[in-house]
Swiss-Prot record:
Class of enzymatic activity (EC top level): hydrolase
EC number: 3.1.11.-
Protein name: 5'-3' exonuclease
Organism: Bacillus subtilis (strain 168)
InterPro entries, per database record: 5-3_exonucl_a-hlix_arch_N (IPR020046), 5-3_exonuclease (IPR002421), 5-3_exonuclease_C_sf (IPR036279), DNA_polI_H3TH (IPR020045), FEN (IPR038969), HhH2 (IPR008918), PIN-like_dom_sf (IPR029060)
Coiled-coil blocks: none
Length: 296
């Protein structure tokens, strides 16, 4: 038995959440170099608090690498409804990665894939080597829940999480975590802009998958459904198949990473230097507290 505890952080979710929490008041915390730091400031607060809360031995922060992925090849309009990031956020992507690295945290991203796919790949890769906690604001990652993987969903404020295990997810929804893929395939996702089956909403999608467990079994028993539902699914088969592929997190991204690479040791001096260099305020005391805990 090992005592490894791996924290997989959805860097995109933390940074976006942190940015918009203060951007609504136009509080961009611009430093002397003219670079906004509000998103990075909040990102670091979320990140350090997660490390304090879950006390991992290993940490990886995962990122999107550009706006286009293999999902755009499957469906041209995937996420096409999303507007471009605000100009004040754009320079903070690289700054957030730099900040995480200076703390001693490994960053991972892979062109053509989303942060979710990197998280799923690492969760699969290290399932036999560590207990894994995923920190995110994205419910799509609940499909990754297993006996070895829990998911901490960010709630309002910093340090507030709703932690799911495979068991608590089933208790809440009546389906197994992997079934979330088929549910999303049926109902679609307006945020990611894929259609699902026209006329099938969330309530019906959950009901159908609770009863039939998978889309494959649902299709085998299509004749048992009410005529209206049969017609909707038959007419939407191609969208259903495509949406299923879009909903599933890809867990075999070719990442070159060992668990040893992700070992976390707080780099206090270089982290403090980075904060001073970029004039990121209010973080150093959090680091000192974290460092004191590590020394003990």
């Amino acid at each position: 038995m090992n005592n490894n505890k791996l924290l997989l952080v959805d860097g995109m979710a933390l940074l976006f959440r942190a940015f918009f929490a203060t951007a609504v008041h136009r509080n961009f915390m611009i430093n002397d170099s003219g670079v906004p730091t509000n998103g990075v400031n909040g990102f670091l607060k979320h990140l350090i608090t997660a490390v304090e809360t879950f006390q991992p031995t290993h940490v990886v922060c995962c990122w999107d690498m550009g706006s286009k992925t293999y999902r755009n090849d499957l469906f041209q309009d995937y996420k096409a409804n999303r507007s471009a990031p605000p100009v004040e956020l754009i320079p903070q992507f690289d700054l957030a990665k730099e900040a995480a690295a200076e703390l001693g945290i490994m960053n991972i991203g892979f062109a053509g894939y989303e942060a979710d796919d990197c998280i799923g790949t690492l969760a699969d890769l290290f399932a036999n080597e560590a207990d894994i906690t995923v920190v995110t604001g994205d419910r799509d990652l609940l499909q990754l829940l297993t006996d070895k993987v829990s998911v901490a969903l960010l709630q309002k404020g910093i340090g507030n999480y709703k932690v799911y295990t495979k068991e608590t997810f089933y208790e809440e929804t009546g389906v197994m975590p992997k079934a979330l893929i088929d549910i999303k395939a049926l109902m679609g996702d307006s945020s990611d802009n894929y259609p699902g089956v026209k006329g099938i909403g969330e309530k019906t999608a959950y009901k159908l998958i609770r009863e039939y467990e998978t889309i494959d079994r649902l299709l085998e028993n299509l004749s048992l459904l009410p005529k209206g539902q049969q017609g909707k699914i038959q007419q939407g088969l191609s969208d259903l198949e495509m949406s299923r592929k879009l909903a599933e997190i890809h867990c075999s991204v070719p990442l070159a990473c060992t668990l040893k690479d992700a070992l976390f040791t707080l780099q206090m001096e270089q982290a403090a230097d980075m904060l001073r260099r970029h004039q990121i305020k209010g973080i150093e005391r959090m680091l000192e507290k974290l460092n004191a805990r590590e020394i003990v």
